[in-house]
């Protein structure tokens, strides 16, 4: 597991089983039992706290990572690797995190 990968996860209800982008730093996946993730949704709102994803990123359809909904979950809720995001897409994720957390300068 490493930052920028997309995995299937069993999130608490009402969210349930869905893909998530791994957000925690790489070392967290080795040493920690809880990790931070961003859910991926088919609902694309085109807002600064979302990152559009799709077939070019290894996903079957157009969707978006929602950084407004980042959450920390037990690592054992991650079940199956889907794909990994490239450098430019992770730059977009970092920008969306800054926006979602109000860290814009």
Regions found by a protein language model. Give the residues of each.
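Conserved functional hotspots at enzyme active or ligand-binding sites that engage polyanionic ligands
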Residues: 1-105
